[in-house]
């Protein structure tokens, strides 16, 4: 899943 910024949500 990705975060709101586009980075991967760890």
From Swiss-Prot:
Alphabetical list of InterPro entries matching this protein: Gastrin/cholecystokinin_CS
Phenylalanine amide modified-residue sites: 10
Compartments, as annotated in UniProt: Secreted
Signal peptide: none
GO biological process, one term: defense response
Keyword Ribonucleoprotein: no
Disulphide-bonded residues: none
Pyrrolidone carboxylic acid: modified positions: 1
Coiled-coil residues: none
Record keyword Iron-sulfur present: no
Tissues expressed in: Expressed by the skin dorsal glands.
Modified sites of kind Sulfotyrosine: 4
GO cellular component: extracellular region
Alphabetized UniProt keyword annotations: Amidation, Amphibian defense peptide, Pyrrolidone carboxylic acid, Secreted, Sulfation
Main location: secreted
Stated role: Induces contraction of intestinal smooth muscle in isolated guinea pig ileum.
Similarity section: Belongs to the gastrin/cholecystokinin family.
Name of the protein: Caerulein
Naturally occurring in which organism (per UniProt): Litoria peronii
